[in-house]
Each structure stands twice: as structure tokens, then as C-alpha cells.
């Protein structure tokens, strides 16, 4: 994949980002304490590490929660740059397997989507090279701010903080 899609900008709004910019956002966000996974997030990330991806239905079973709580847990992990949408599949229902426009998403780690390593997702992935930013977290933030200001020169510092976290 060359494009990240998930809820990671403006406090959890859906967005697209190229690998170059997503890696820098990931580098910056993961350096901050407020973007560390909670207990539920850690359980989800362990399951993703073992299986390569996870769906909302699987999160519900794993945590024993309703759909809204599973959606919220996934959205937090997307905002923390821990998960991105890896795949979308159509849902076919009924005896004739009719498609009514419903789709289901699976979520994976950005490292599994963007890493150049030949290893498939799963438990052995821990031994492969992780996606590495080429900058320090503060340099990543500066890089992202400069890019946004080139596109939106009237953006304020407050706007940048709300956008990037």
C-alpha cells in the first residue's frame, strides 16, 4: 500500500495520507504519552500482531463489548497511529448472496501495510525491520507543519495543533 486511510486527523476524522507523511505523523504521535494504547488497545494490538489484521466483529468478541465500544477502541488506535484500514470487503447476505451496499473493514498495523520486509504479517513479523522515520519526533512535527503551511498558508498554530495532535 502507498496510501494510509483511517481516523487519524482532526481528533479522529477519516483521512488519507501518503506513506511519507503518515510515517512522520506516526513518528511524532507515538513519541507522546497521550498516544499510547490503553489496556483494551494493547489486547487489540496483540491480536493484530498474531493474526495480521482484525475486524470490528473480532474486536467485539475479544473485548466482550458492543459495536459502539469496539468502534471507539479502533478509532483510538487509528488516532494513535497504531492501526490503519488494511482492506474493505463487500458483505453478501441472504440465500442469493445479495449485496446491499454494506462493507466491512479489516484493520492492520501501518508497519504491515508499508514495510518493505518480505515477511508476512504474523508473529514472526516482530523479527523484521519496523517502519522507521528518518527524523526525530520534533523534526517530524516541523516537517508536517511546514507541509501543511505550504498547502494552507493561513493556518494558525492552533489549527496545526488540532490537525496534527
What are these regions (language model features)?
Residues 1-165:
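Long, low-complexity intrinsically disordered regions
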Amino acid at each position: 500500500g502507498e496510501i494510509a486511510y483511517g481516523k487519524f486527523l482532526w481528533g479522529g476524522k477519516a483521512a488519507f495520507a501518503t506513506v511519507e507523511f503518515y510515517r512522520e505523523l506516526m513518528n511524532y504521535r507515538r513519541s507522546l504519552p497521550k498516544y499510547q494504547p490503553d489496556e483494551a488497545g494493547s489486547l487489540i494490538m496483540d491480536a493484530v500482531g498474531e493474526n495480521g489484521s482484525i475486524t470490528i466483529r473480532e474486536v467485539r468478541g475479544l473485548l466482550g463489548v458492543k459495536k459502539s465500544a469496539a468502534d471507539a477502541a479502533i478509532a483510538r488506535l487509528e488516532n494513535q497511529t497504531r492501526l490503519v484500514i488494511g482492506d474493505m470487503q463487500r458483505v453478501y447476505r441472504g440465500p442469493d448472496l445479495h449485496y446491499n451496499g454494506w462493507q466491512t473493514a479489516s484493520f492492520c498495523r501501518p508497519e504491515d501495510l508499508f514495510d518493505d520486509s518480505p515477511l508476512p504479517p504474523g508473529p514472526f513479523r516482530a523479527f523484521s525491520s519496523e517502519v522507521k522515520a528518518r527524523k526525530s519526533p520534533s523534526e517530524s512535527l516541523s516537517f508536517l507543519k511546514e507541509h501543511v503551511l505550504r498547502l494552507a498558508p493561513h493556518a494558525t498554530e492552533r489549527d496545526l495543533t488540532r490537525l496534527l495532535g
